[in-house]
């Protein structure tokens, strides 16, 4: 009997070992392909904004680096006390929400003044800030009521909504149930449910928004909407890569891509989906295996893309139970044509 049990145990052990060899941990495969950088921006990525040639990122702290440059991020010194829960920008001014002991305070910082210090936005009890031109501050009045105020880029009256904002871009604020202008009015023709993300579009008054099945583009100059089916499973975030005329839509396994017809075409009827590793993709053919074995396997939220002087850079907030790998990852073309920790 003991011999039979031993033989059975040995057989099971061999199956487990062989299975492990055939299915190595995803990020173990990464470390076989590239040497991982020491992580600077760890954990949950709460946002990245651009002011001039400088990028600012938050993971509770605020970090900065020159746009397009590889290497470590530097921690911004002299920030207010508390956890930075989000960033927004209007012109040279950086806005941030800080939480301490369940109390939230909004501050702003003039990046154009070398001796600038953080200044509180007084008379405001807001939980979050959003925006890339107009800055929207959000206060929670009850479990079903929120007040939204424009604190930079205009001065319309505050307005109430039953939905917490998804995000903001240009002069628009996105709610789960529709796109609003800076006065709180719903944009005519807006999709009205399940909206997941917003980013700036290719022209000065255009934005992209996304839901579970479609990518939409709103052109404010012509007041027109167009859309295309995107095919991304459980969209999380979107960004526009101007250099390649691509909308990147992050999901639960990497990101999908939509190619515009031209640098200024907002009509998604002329757009098409592209496959990672194809000629139009932001993932070069030579990088497809490393992409598939790394960020292409995991939930990305958020995602950001920026043009550089010679190409482009993509940042992905990787969300994984293994905290060793969660945090901000970057891809630089040229400079670092591989996905690696920031």
Segments predicted by a language model, with ranges:
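Bacterial Sec-dependent N-terminal signal peptides
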Residues: 13-46, 52
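Surface-exposed loop and turn segments in beta-propeller and other repeat-based domains
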Residues: 34, 272-296
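Post-signal-peptide N-terminal segment of Sec-exported extracytoplasmic proteins
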Residues: 39-77
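Repeated scaffold domains used in trafficking and secretory/extracellular systems
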Residues: 42-50, 81-92, 121-138, 160-176, ...
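Blade-level signature of beta-propeller repeat domains, shared across WD40, Kelch, NHL, RCC1
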Residues: 300-342
